[in-house]
Each structure stands twice: as C-alpha cells, then as structure tokens.
Amino acid sequence: FKQKPKGSKAWYKKVGVVYQNPDYQLFMPTVRQEISFGAKSEEYAAEIAELFGVKHLWERHPQSLSEGQKRRVSIAAVAACDPEVLLLDEPTVGQDYDGLCALVEILNKLHMQSGNTMITITHDVRCAEALCDRAYLIADGVVQRSGGKELVREYFTP
C-alpha cells in the first residue's frame, strides 16, 4: 500500500463507469449540468442528450425524473466524457420492453459513432444478446465460459 502501481491514475481517464443505481452518480442541479460536467464540449453534451432522448429535460433536476429517465441521463453523462471504455452495470434494470429496446438502440448508435468499447454487466438475456459481440459467463467470481452471441442463446435457451 506504500506505492501505487505505475499508471494507476491513467485508467480512470479512459474508463467511464455507469452504476446500476443512477442515484449514486446524479449530483448536479440540472440535466444540462449533469451531462455537460465532464463532456469534451457543451455542443457534444447537447448532441449526446439528443441521442439519449433527454434534451427536452435539459433544465430539470435529475432527481425529479423517472427511473428510466435517470438511467438514460446517467449513461449520457458518462458517454459525454467520451471514454475509451464504457462500463455499464445492469443498464436495463427496471426498463419495460419498449424502454429496453430504445436503450439498446441508443447504445448501439453510440458505439457505432464513438467506436468505444462497451462492457455490459447484465442478467438480462435480451440485453446481452442485443449488445454483445463477446459474452463471458461468470459464476462464483470465475469465468466459466466465453464466446459470441451464440453462447448467450445456448446458455439461456431451455
């Protein structure tokens, strides 16, 4: 503990983390300030807000939003920082089918535009199948298997 590993500070500038509970990361007084906080520019923040469908909420307080809106704002705020790696912890929790489809479409568009790596932690088979190129099945903290989309289908098909 006396010495940090070399380069330990560099990773947090490259990795954007979105927590399962958006309340853990929403702290600014408006959606605009939340998404603009770490954004590479105000214009890019507005572009990301538009992509995530939250631009119309620009002047609202994040805590006044629905859970689905909070989730989209929290992901948009991290995405606006333009990280090389976007780590999403259960991004579709609490979403109805329409919300899940919309969020998956947004995340796929974001990936196509930015070219960033997305790592998604999920128990939602639909989310995994729609977002992943590679899948890792983990049990008791150990990777049991890895593969492509076919692994998701194979593992979760009765």
Residue ranges, per PLM feature:
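A short, surface-exposed alpha-helical micro-motif characterized by mixed small hydrophobic
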Residues: 128-130
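Conserved ABC ATPase "signature" region
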Residues: 43-57
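H-loop/switch region of ABC-family ATPase nucleotide-binding domains
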Residues: 122-123
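Conserved ABC ATPase signature
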Residues: 61-65, 69
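Catalytic Walker B motif of ABC-type/P-loop ATPase nucleotide-binding domains
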Residues: 86-89
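Hydrophobic anchor residue at the start of the ABC signature
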Residues: 75-76
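Conserved beta-strand-loop-alpha-helix hinge in the C-terminal portion
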Residues: 142-158
